[in-house]
């Protein structure tokens, strides 16, 4: 059997990725919690920041919902909204990268997988980036990296603290080295932000993996995480096969990482804005007017 035939067999279903599938969440009016099975009215779930009132499970939310939970009302100013990805490599796997981009843009209304801007949190100005897992798994390509880098540089110039909400499967393979170099570019911008003695906090949400974890997600002065978020670099099964040993059941969860010193604090979504405001005040940040972006 040739190598090509070997891969073809696996594409037919002999190899199944170890991905936990989300259960059906209802018909648009109701949502079923994947953790406890509780069926809840969708409007009630949204009013509770998409957190299950029965078990505390944090449902996945998009970038717009995330920004609304963090920023003071009407305070968010979008930056670099006109940046959009291209296909410099002409990449094609099962489908062309250009087709995947068009599909994600149509389904999400976004140009790429992150929204960046300036906002206030209880009157305190800061830079804010919110990654959106709906857009190609929140993967980090050249536009995601450029928008985050520009936000960091703008926050540094304005002497503002910074929060990046991470939700990503890692570097975008369809862009090859162009995506991988974003790790170093963002890290360099964060170092200049640190040299200016400014506060940077990443918020690790479910999931935060791959090249995002290996770069800016772990470079914060304070590393925050949502409860039970999946956080890691390589997949659990890959690690088990490499080490040839069974990993703990809670391995790569926010709680496991906090226990081992990789996460500073776990913040329930319903307490996020007040917690951020307290942390900003503790670091000497004060309410002030935010000039236009």
Swiss-Prot record:
SUPFAM superfamilies: ClpP/crotonase (SSF52096). Zn(2+) binds at residues 33, 36, 52, 55. A zinc finger (C4-type) spans 33-55. Binds 1 zinc ion per subunit. GO terms for cellular component: acetyl-CoA carboxylase complex. Residues 29-293 form the CoA carboxyltransferase N-terminal domain. Pathway: Lipid metabolism; malonyl-CoA biosynthesis; malonyl-CoA from acetyl-CoA: step 1/1. Keywords: ATP-binding, Cytoplasm, Fatty acid biosynthesis, Fatty acid metabolism, Lipid biosynthesis, Lipid metabolism, Metal-binding, Nucleotide-binding, Transferase, Zinc, Zinc-finger. Its cofactor is Zn(2+). GO terms for biological process: fatty acid biosynthetic process; malonyl-CoA biosynthetic process. Its EC number is 2.1.3.15. Belongs to the AccD/PCCB family. This is Acetyl-coenzyme A carboxylase carboxyl transferase subunit beta. It comes from Synechococcus sp. (strain CC9605). The gene is accD.
